[in-house]
C-alpha cells in the first residue's frame, strides 16, 4: 500500500529555481504600478522621519561597481528605517556641471567643438548630462533602489542653481570671498584650476637634480638645493632653510658648499662625493637675509627661514618659487615678501617672462633647463625618482601649482576654520576614525579656490570695470542674477548683455563707471554639490535639515562632506548632517585596484543580467564595507551558492505552511519544548540582527541570518520537526505547534532579509497567505518585535546542553553508518549511559521528545558508573512504511499493513 498521499508533504509555487533575471524586472514593474515610493511614505505618514540625503553621483557614463555599492548601501539603510516605522523619503540627485562632462562632450564633438560658442557648448553639455541622468536612473532602479525617481534633483536645474547663488551671496556679503594671485593646483591639459578634492595621487617618474647657487659676494661659496621640478627654477626667488637645524660649510675641492648637517652624508652619497671636510657649523637662522645668485637668470635669490623645511630628503635648503607652491607662496611671498614669478600659461607653456624658455612646454623645458645647468657648471647630480605625485581626476595627467588670479573662500574669516572644527564634534562619525580624518583635513586645508576656467559650470557673476580695471562682485549683483537664473537658467550669463545682467543704475563702486564687462569664471563643482542641503533639504517639505545621514565613500571627507559642512556652518552655523557613514573602495580578489587594462573589472549590470540584483546586494551585505572590499566573478559565484541556501530555506518554510492559518496558531505555553526553544532562539536572532542593522553593520546581520538559515534551521530545527510536520495529523497540536514557529520564523526572516534581498523577499511575501493582515509590499510590514516572554531561560539553558549531546549522538550515528550497522538514523536505537545526575535528570525531563530530537527510532537513558557514553544498535521491530521509524508493534493491524501504531492512529483519525 502506498501511504505517500497520507503524508503532509510540503507544497508551494515559490519555485526552487530563482530565475531572478526574469523575475526582478516583473517585481520592478509591480513597484512602479503601485508607486511604491509614495505608498510607503503615505503608509508611514504620521511617523517620525529619517532622511538619508543622497550625495549626487556624477552624470557621466554607465554606473560602475562603486556607484552601485553606494546606492545599494543607501537603499539598505532606507529600507531598514522604513521597516522600523520611520517615514524615510529618499530623493536621488546628480552632479551635472564641471570638467568631466565638458571634456566628454568636446571629445565627442571633435573639431566642431572649436567653432562653437560658449552657449552652444553649454547646451550640448546640458543635453548630454540629462541623457546620462536618464540612463543612470534606469540602472539604479534595476538594482532595486527605491526613491523619488520622478522628482530627482540635479545641479543644473534653475531652482537648484538659484539656491547656489543664495549661498554665494551670503559668502560674499559676510566677507568670505576674495580674489588674489596665488598658486593653485592647475591642470595644463584641461586648462583649469582644481580643488584638492579633484586630485588623485599616482606614481610618477620625475627628474631629481642637485643644484648649486653661488652666494653673493663670494668667489667659491655655494648653497646646495635639491628639486624634482626643474621647470620651476625660472620662478625661483628664494631659498628656505630651517631656523633651528644645524647647517655646515664643507670644503669640496676648491669650493665651499652649504647644506644641512643631518642630510650631509646622504646628499654626498647621492652626488657622488667621497672626500670633503667640514669647516664650520651653525644654525640655519644665521643664513637668513643672505643672497644667492640664480644659476640661470640675472637675479638674486634671498635666503629665508621656514619651519616646514624637513630633514628627510634633499639638502635642507629648499628652492622657493612663490608662483608654484602653497608653502612657497605663504612663507616666501606673504611672510618674507619674495616676488611671485609664474611664467607658465594655462596650457603649460612658458611665457615671455621665462626668457629663452618662452614658448616651450614645461615637460620639454625640464630637459633644457637641466642641460643649461650642466653647461654652466651649476648641476651637481641628475637622476630619476619615482614618487607619489598629484594628477588630475579627469584626464589623469600630472598637475602643477601655477599662480593665477582666482576667487577664494577664506577659511580664517569670521573664525571659520575653528567653527567648522567645533561643529565636527556635533556629528556621529561611522566609523569613528572619520572624525579625526575630516578634522585633520579642515585643520590643514588652505583657503578654498572656488573659481574654474571652464564653460560648463555655474558662472560667477563678476564684472571687470573697463575704466579702472577693478573686479566687481557683491551680494546685490549675485542676488539680482539669481532672479534671472530662476527664470532662464545660468545660460543667461552667456546669452544676455552686461546691461541686461546688471541691476538698473548699477555703477562701478570703485570709480563710478557704467562700463562693466562680465567675466567668464565658473564655480567649483564642490560649491554646486555642497549646496545641496540648501537646494534640496530646506526646500522639499518631506525632507529635513539637517539630514539624519550622509553616506558616501571615505574620499568624501575631503570632498562632499567637507564642502557641505563648510557652507552649512557659514549659512546656518551647524552641520548639514547628524550622522556621516562612510564606505571603503572596491578592489579585485587580490586587493588590486580595478582597471579595464588589468581585465579585473566587475560590471554590476552584467551581474544583474547573469545572476540578478539580489545576488549583488547579498555580496555587498556580506562585505565589511567600512573598509576596502573585494569582488571578482568567483566571489560573486560564492554568493550565488549562499543565495540558494537562503531561498531553499524560505521555500521549505512556505511549503510546510501551505495549510496553515494564523487562526491555527498555538499559544507559547502549549507548544512542544523544542518549539518553545526555537521561538526563543528566534527572539535572540531578532535582537542580534536588529543591533547589527542599528549600527549599520550589515555584514554582521548577514552572517547571523545566513548561519541561522543554514545551521540552526536547516541542520537542526527543521531537521528535527520534519517528521512531525510530515507524519502527524494535519490539525494536531504537535504539527500546529511546529507550524506556528515556522510562520513566525518565515515572517521574521522575510522582513529582516528584505533590506538586502529586496526582490526575493517581495516575491516570497506574495505567497504569504495565512489569513493575517497583509500589505501590498513586504516593505510596509513592521520590523519583528523582540519578545522577552518567548525566552524561557531555563528551557534555553536545557537545550544548550541537549544540543551538545545531540552533536555526540550524531557523531556516534555517523560512525555506525560508516560501519554498515545502519543506513538512515531512523534505523537506530540509541542508548545514552552516564553517571551524571544532572545529565540523567535533563534527559528524563525531555525523554518524551528525544526520539524526535535525535531523529532515531528509540532512545534509552541508562544510569552508569562510567562517564557519558553513547551506544548505537539497530532498532528493534519492523520499519513503518509511512514514517520509516522502527517499532515492535508495526504491522499489528491488518487494516493498515506495515504501519506503526502512531501512524495508524493518524490514519484512523483522518478517516
UniProtKB/Swiss-Prot annotation:
ATP binds at residue 596. Zn(2+) binds at residues 880, 883, 900, 903. Its cofactor is Zn(2+). It is found in: Cytoplasm. SUPFAM superfamilies: Anticodon-binding domain of a subclass of class I aminoacyl-tRNA synthetases (SSF47323), Nucleotidylyl transferase (SSF52374), ValRS/IleRS/LeuRS editing domain (SSF50677). GO terms for molecular function: aminoacyl-tRNA deacylase activity; ATP binding; isoleucine-tRNA ligase activity; tRNA binding; zinc ion binding. It catalyses: tRNA(Ile) + L-isoleucine + ATP = L-isoleucyl-tRNA(Ile) + AMP + diphosphate. HAMAP family: Ile_tRNA_synth_type1 (MF_02002). IleRS has two distinct active sites: one for aminoacylation and one for editing. The misactivated valine is translocated from the active site to the editing site, which sterically excludes the correctly activated isoleucine. The single editing site contains two valyl binding pockets, one specific for each substrate (Val-AMP or Val-tRNA(Ile)). Catalyzes the attachment of isoleucine to tRNA(Ile). As IleRS can inadvertently accommodate and process structurally similar amino acids such as valine, to avoid such errors it has two additional distinct tRNA(Ile)-dependent editing activities. One activity is designated as 'pretransfer' editing and involves the hydrolysis of activated Val-AMP. The other activity is designated 'posttransfer' editing and involves deacylation of mischarged Val-tRNA(Ile). Monomer. Belongs to the class-I aminoacyl-tRNA synthetase family. IleS type 1 subfamily. This is Isoleucine--tRNA ligase. It comes from Pseudothermotoga lettingae (strain ATCC BAA-301 / DSM 14385 / NBRC 107922 / TMO). The gene is ileS.
